[in-house]
Amino acid sequence: VVVGEWGDADPWAAANDDAYASLLAHVRTGPRGPVPVDLDALGWEWGTPRGRVRAAAARLEDLGILSRRPDGSWWYDELSDADLSDTLDFWVALVGPALRATIPALTPELRAELDRRVARARTTAALRLPEYPTAFSAACQFWFEHSPNTLVRSLGLRAFERMRWARVPTQLWSVHEVHTWFATTSRAVESGDPAVATAAAEVMDGLFEVHRRNVGIPRTHRPADDTTEDRVGPVGRTLLRDVRSGALVVGSTHRLEDLVTRTGATPEQVHGALRWLHDLGLVDDGDGRYRVGQPSLATWRDTMELLTGVFTHGAVHVLPGLRGPALEEFRMLVARARADGQVRDHRYTESSFAVTRFLSEQSGNRWVREALRLAMARLAYALPEAPAFRQWDAEALWLTLDAAAGSGDVETARAAARRFVDVARAHVDDVTARWGTMGS
């Protein structure tokens, strides 16, 4: 195995930026698709190492505009209306977590940068200048670019790239009436109140509804089984077992070829497994070697914030429209979680998270489903032992969820989502306080 031939476990590492820009330019200046893309030929033409080109392809695969077929060939195509609809929703789902994570970390320098971006966006919006869409995007992306939550930052920047490059030419932001968004985010910054940040995220959700109508991208209502996503395979499970058991020691480094020998799998399978472990926060890479990371409370906390965004999306866009067997199943799950909490049953952790899992699995949004699976896996493996959920007094949450289910009432669903955010933050505070007694 040639060192670096398969690319990095993190294709979004800065070292791959040049190859990404070249590959993106190549596909966007060619036919709309679907068209094949010869990565080896392009790498030779550009004089770029094979691993860099593959990493660039993996980025475009993450965005959904490049796909790999069973025969190993790569194909480019624009996002469908349904996938673009999902993309808009997923970015909005991350706005709340980004605001809640970034506002407490603002320095005077960052405040000044934010003020400059907001002033530029306000001015260009009022004057209807052609640079307004770019200025507005810069003001919004501030919250992701400077977020201390590395997971939300990474997913948010990728989601923005997906919106940006989904179509040729790029579909521009179309809503000029954005005063309420900037006023609410300003109030969130001044007050430091997470509830105001949540309210700002709800304003952005409303702006995107207007944008959808303006550009003709209706909301997706496809069934959950109409989406496609990669699931972890046996090689990933094998390496996860070795990391969790200590067979692969924390801090140890390994070459790809050594892991190929260890697992008996192909380099491509091992590399895919390493990408998954990297996404879980368990593996880092550099110079062709892979390092087993240290489980951390920071990784767990970041993931809980992501979970609030995923849950909010499910509550608002799935819960009001539940019908038939799905509605019955959801109410059964809520009743079980409520009952387990009332008697402080040890099953409460699983029954509570089953409610979250159900909402996102009911969504036909592929990006939300993938983020949910990522969040649940990180919560399970970010710490040496997954912490118990001990928010016993969550009666108001369960009752509001039950009331919102199948009601057709989005406002009741939003109220349930806000209660979930509060309960999740209390869970984070509880686990943070207990961390010193939870083992190494």
Language model regions located:
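Acidic/polar helix N-cap motif
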Residues: 80, 128, 192-193, 296, ...
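Regular secondary-structure segments
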Residues: 24, 28-31, 99, 103, ...
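Short loop-to-helix capping motifs
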Residues: 39, 147-150, 192-193, 363-366, ...
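Amphipathic alpha-helical repeat elements characteristic of tetratricopeptide repeat
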Residues: 17, 21, 92, 96, ...
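C-terminal all-alpha effector/ligand-binding and dimerization domain
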Residues: 168-232, 237, 384-440
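Conserved amphipathic alpha-helical segments that form helical-bundle/coiled-coil interaction surfaces
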Residues: 109-170, 182, 199-210, 325-387, ...
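Short linear motifs at protein or domain termini
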Residues: 1-100, 104, 212-313, 320, ...
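Helix-loop "lid/cap" segments that line or gate small-molecule binding pockets
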Residues: 95-105, 141-148, 311-321, 357-364, ...
